[in-house]
């Protein structure tokens, strides 16, 4: 089992998109009240007094949409300035990024992942669940701006949805050829949303829940060829290059290939729940309640340390326990991805 040194921190469960694999339109979502979110000060306290002493040094800010979090630039600056912070990154949908990219970069954000599931504005609108015009164009502007201000390499996350955007695999992979962009293809994972896209004829026709990474790789391999890359990130992606490309293509295969032995992370939800595994809901700790009840940082740290010792069992032996019935208590937007 890898050393666990990477914490994904969800800052907010709200989003300005309604991506169908994350928070589908029409679903009843109980948003966290603002007073139930971990505060700026509570987050910094947990990092300084609990996680960093336990060896965590890599932090990723997620959501919901993290750029909706009030004071996001100040929070980035405070986390980046912690002496133990080796890497600080963010996953965003990019819609608000054009006006914030420069400030985030100057505040100390090292890396950024931007969700881009389609190059077709109409398909993009379908996936994000919005009818408002120019959503794709604004997102694309955010991507270009982030690259221009210094986020180089830039990572683009693509959730491949059968019958919806799988016909764009080659076009999206091609983005890695001329710029130092890392394209990450992610297997569709219907956590908390068992009816995802069930009303779309394309999905019914496709007759499958996800497109396996090997199938995606083969499409790219047949067009250009693929070679293994010596660039490795902090996550579970298997990374390759199109020969001669400036960037890379990576594959995150949480549905078709078990990578529990490479897991190096935990997840902290916006309301303070620490989750050791994405695929099940065993062993979670309510850190916010402990903190607000006056429990000492030492005591909280001991509880997290114990969770770290049992994490391998949770990853391996209980890997599928969160979906025995096909139902998760939380959607991806609430977990933080």
Curated annotation (Swiss-Prot):
Binding site for [4Fe-4S] cluster 2: 260, 263, 277
Binding site for GTP: 8, 60, 91, 155, 265-267
Keyword Iron recorded: yes
Catalysed reactions listed for this entry: GTP + AH2 + S-adenosyl-L-methionine = (8S)-3',8-cyclo-7,8-dihydroguanosine 5'-triphosphate + 5'-deoxyadenosine + L-methionine + A + H(+)
Note on how the cofactor is bound: Binds 2 [4Fe-4S] clusters. Binds 1 [4Fe-4S] cluster coordinated with 3 cysteines and an exchangeable S-adenosyl-L-methionine and 1 [4Fe-4S] cluster coordinated with 3 cysteines and the GTP-derived substrate.
Keyword Transmembrane helix attributed: no
E.C. number: 4.1.99.22
Keywords, ordered alphabetically: 4Fe-4S, GTP-binding, Iron, Iron-sulfur, Lyase, Metal-binding, Molybdenum cofactor biosynthesis, Nucleotide-binding, S-adenosyl-L-methionine
Molecular-function GO term, any one: metal ion binding
Pathway: Cofactor biosynthesis; molybdopterin biosynthesis
Cofactor entry: [4Fe-4S] cluster
EC category: lyase
Binding site for S-adenosyl-L-methionine: 21, 64, 115, 189
GO biological process per UniProt: Mo-molybdopterin cofactor biosynthetic process
Binding site for [4Fe-4S] cluster 1: 15, 19, 22
Role summary: Catalyzes the cyclization of GTP to (8S)-3',8-cyclo-7,8-dihydroguanosine 5'-triphosphate.
Recorded family membership: Belongs to the radical SAM superfamily. MoaA family.
Protein name: GTP 3',8-cyclase
Classification of source organism: Bacteria, Bacillati, Cyanobacteriota, Cyanophyceae, Oscillatoriophycideae
